[in-house]
């Protein structure tokens, strides 16, 4: 039995210089698992609650000492002596101990740090790489990366309303080659921006954050970068967007306000706006194309684009099986973004991935804008054969740590590693 003998929570910093929670779990054998949790900027209103101290005299109120104290006291008491290999039982113990619907008492950040650290310790004890511990012998599919090379919206201080402009390398036969392609496009884009006298400073997720006059100008420039790097847009590399539409939706008026372009659009008009972009550019995926509360708008968008574009629910579904189930029943979207800290335990994360797959929805494993060097999501992507990962641009170590872990996993898998390319969009025609 892999009995838990010690648990230590601590406050560390994320990639934005804000406090986050890290946890060490020690087993009887002397093996240790360590995990740190991420934090988001644009968050869904129904996400599990991240516990912050609220003490303005310390880290501007963003300290996490309360969450850390919960780990070091009542969580520690509740799981001490439990078998680390019993992940589902352990996560259920945490959920019952918290006793709230949204994990607001103990904090999803405290619970997730423990959940992840336990899994890492158990994998180490079993002598297995983490992805293999998660997925067994069937884990062999590398994910297609969604690489966020231009940041706008809440992730950057510029005039772009759409939050992320991403590239997806799809013609390659390995993750290693896909990563190279992404990096070469990233550097080509930097040169184009530099030649135009535009900013090459990067946003929270490592993408560039220049001031473009419109979303179309940005997309044209990304296509230019793909071609400058020697690839074909639409063949070798596809485009993806994260609108984060909740951020510019005015519920009282029922309009989407694209301030950068001086547009105020109804749900139907915004769906037409996005469809027009998809007609002009090789866009294969749109995340949060409507606001989380605008389910009618989501239905309109799904009916219009759902057969040819991956429509990913992030703020919409918040990695929650109850909300996802409702979305599946109503025919809303066709894909879910998986963010481990939106739900707060690994068991619930895996349940959301499984539910999506059974319904013919794709699952995209994702980072948050406030990240750490922890690379667990890379192992989750391969362990669940998710087929897609979204973990930022080709700069900043907090993003690169996930890509480097995927390189190691692909090397470990050897000849049995597969790279799905375009077939990762198995529900599109």
UniProtKB/Swiss-Prot annotation:
Can you tell which superkingdom this protein's organism belongs to? Answer: Bacteria
Species, as recorded: Cupriavidus metallidurans (strain ATCC 43123 / DSM 2839 / NBRC 102507 / CH34)
- Mention any one GO cellular component term assigned to this protein in its UniProt record: cell surface
Could you tell me the EC number(s) of this protein? 4.2.1.11
Q: Name one GO biological process term.
A: glycolytic process
Cross-referenced SMART domains: Enolase_C, Enolase_N
Q: Which residues does the Swiss-Prot or TrEMBL record annotate as the active site?
A: 205 (proton donor), 339 (proton acceptor)
The upper taxonomy is: Bacteria, Pseudomonadati, Pseudomonadota, Betaproteobacteria, Burkholderiales
Family affiliation: Belongs to the enolase family.
For this entry, the protein name equals Enolase 1
HAMAP family, sorted: Enolase
**UniProt main location, coarse:** cytoplasm
Ordered alphabetically, the record's keywords are: Cytoplasm, Glycolysis, Lyase, Magnesium, Metal-binding, Secreted
What functional role does this protein have?
Answer: Catalyzes the reversible conversion of 2-phosphoglycerate (2-PG) into phosphoenolpyruvate (PEP). It is essential for the degradation of carbohydrates via glycolysis.
Q: Where does Mg(2+) bind?
A: 242, 287, 314
């Amino acid at each position: 039995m892999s009995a838990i003998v010690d648990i230590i929570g601590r406050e560390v910093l994320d990639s934005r210089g804000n406090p986050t929670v890290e946890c060490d779990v020690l087993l009887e054998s002397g093996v240790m698992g360590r995990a740190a949790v991420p934090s988001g900027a644009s968050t869904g209103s129904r996400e599990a609650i991240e516990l912050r101290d609220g003490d303005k005299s310390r880290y501007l109120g963003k300290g996490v000492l309360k969450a850390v104290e919960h780990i070091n006291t009542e969580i520690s008491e509740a799981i001490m002596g439990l078998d680390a290999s019993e992940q589902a039982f352990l996560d259920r113990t945490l959920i019952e101990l918290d006793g709230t619907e949204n994990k607001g008492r103990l904090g999803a950040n405290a619970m997730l740090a423990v959940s992840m650290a336990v899994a890492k310790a158990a994998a180490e004890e079993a002598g297995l790489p983490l992805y293999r511990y998660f997925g067994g012998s069937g884990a062999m599919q590398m994910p297609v990366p969604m690489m966020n090379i231009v940041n706008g919206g809440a992730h950057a201080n510029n005039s772009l309303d759409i939050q992320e402009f991403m590239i997806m390398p799809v013609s390659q036969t390995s993750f290693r080659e896909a990563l190279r392609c992404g990096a070469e496009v990233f550097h080509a884009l930097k040169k184009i921006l530099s030649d135009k006298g535009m900013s090459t400073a990067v946003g929270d997720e490592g993408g560039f954050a220049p001031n473009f006059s419109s979303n179309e100008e940005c997309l044209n420039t990304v296509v230019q970068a793909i071609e400058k790097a020697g690839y074909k847009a639409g063949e070798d590399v596809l485009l993806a967007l994260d609108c984060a539409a909740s951020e510019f939706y005015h519920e009282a008026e029922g309009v989407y306000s694209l301030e950068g372009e001086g547009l105020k659009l109804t749900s139907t008009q915004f769906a037409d706006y996005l469809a027009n972009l998809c007609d002009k550019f090789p866009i294969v995926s749109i995340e949060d194309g409507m606001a989380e509360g605008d389910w009618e708008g989501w239905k309109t968008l799904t009916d219009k684009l759902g057969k040819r574009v991956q429509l990913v629910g992030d703020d919409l579904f918040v990695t929650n099986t109850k909300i996802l189930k409702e979305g599946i029943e109503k025919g809303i979207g066709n894909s879910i973004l998986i963010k481990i800290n939106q739900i707060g335990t690994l068991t619930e994360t895996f349940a959301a991935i499984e539910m999506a797959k059974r319904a013919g929805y794709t699952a995209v494993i994702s980072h948050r804008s406030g990240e750490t060097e922890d690379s667990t999501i890379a192992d989750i992507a391969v362990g669940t054969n998710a087929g897609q990962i979204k973990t930022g641009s080709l700069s900043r170590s907090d993003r690169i740590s996930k890509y480097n872990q995927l390189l190691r996993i692909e090397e470990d898998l050897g000849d049995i590693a597969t790279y799905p390319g375009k077939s990762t969009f198995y529900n599109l025609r």
